[in-house]
Every structure is written in C-alpha cells, then in structure tokens.
Amino acid sequence: VMALGLSSLGLILLPPRRIAFALGFVVCAGLMAWAFWLEHIEGLSPCPLCMFQRVAVVAIGLIFLAGAFHDPGRVGAWIYAGLLFVASASGAALATRQVWLQSLPKDQVPACGMGLSYMMDTLPFVDVIRRVLEGSGECADKGWVFLGLSIAGWTLSFFVAIAVAGFALVKRD
C-alpha cells in the first residue's frame, strides 16, 4: 500500500493503481446492480435522463476495467484520468440537469414526453439527444430520496467523486 500526502488532510492510503482501477469497476457494477434493483424490484421506471446517466456509469466502469487489465504507467494513467474526467463530466452535466428539473416548482416542470425506446425507434439520433437533454415531467419526479438527495443528486455526487479519483490515480507515482 502506497501513501499519498495531501497538505491539510494528512495521509490517505491508496492501493496500487491496478487494484484502484478494479475497485472503480466494482463500484460501477454495484451502482448498475442497484439501478436495476430499483427498476425491476422496487418498480422505479428510469426517465430518459436516468438512462443517459446509466450510460455514463457504464462508460466509467469500462474505463476502470480497461485500466485494471492494462495497469498503465504514468502517461497511461493520465490518459485514463482524462477519459474518466470526460465520462464523469458528461454524467455530472446530465445529473445536474435532472437535479435542476427536480428543483422546479410544479407549474414550471416540462410536460411528460415520449419514452426513450419510442424516441430511439422514431426520431433521428440528434433529435433524441436534444429531447432527452430538454428533460420532461418524468425527469422531475424524485421517486427515491435518501439523506435528502434524490437518485440524481447521488449520481451527481458519484460523478464528481470519479472526476477527482481519476486524477488521484495519476498521483500514484
């Protein structure tokens, strides 16, 4: 186990980079398992913004998995950190949009729109992305709340943590 000194926080022990990448993958797999549990067992249907956030979590998981197998050196770690940042920033933007929609007064919430699968079947892909990013009434429904945060709030926290963790992996050397 290696140590990374942080000025005001003291020492934080970090595992070797390959193990850290593997742990990142396991966390993403756990988040996806939780999402499927909420959907299929608890009956919470994901809105289109939720589905796009799931894509971001899967992308992050695949980047972590590739890093675990590759075990990159310093330059490779910077590349993985950049990829993790792009994927987590994209997810954070989606989650931020959903948190904003959830904060709107009821009379300002957009009307419910088409389901994602229907949009994918009938609209050009660019229009699907535009409509999903605009949000709809179902995206404003908080559904499940824990410690005052909706699922979108928790995923936003996850995406921010991943952006930071990706660059912490670079500091391993």
For every predicted segment, state its role.
Residues 2-7, 65-73, 164-173:
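Structural signal for the C-terminal ends of transmembrane alpha-helices
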Residues 14-25, 72-94, 164, 168:
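Interfacial segments of alpha-helical transmembrane regions
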Residues 28-45, 64-67, 130-131:
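Immediate flanking context of iron-sulfur cluster ligation sites
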Residues 30-39, 89-105, 125:
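C-terminal TM-helix exit segments that contain a strictly Trp-centered aromatic cap at the helix terminus
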Residues 44-54, 80, 110-113:
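Non-cytosolic membrane-interface motifs at loop->transmembrane helix junctions
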Residues 52-67, 117-121:
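Iron-sulfur (Fe-S) cluster-binding segments and ferredoxin-like electron-carrier domains
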Residues 103-147:
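Extracytosolic (periplasmic/ER-lumenal) interhelical loops and adjacent juxtamembrane/interface segments
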Residues 133-173:
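A hydrophobic membrane-anchoring alpha-helix module
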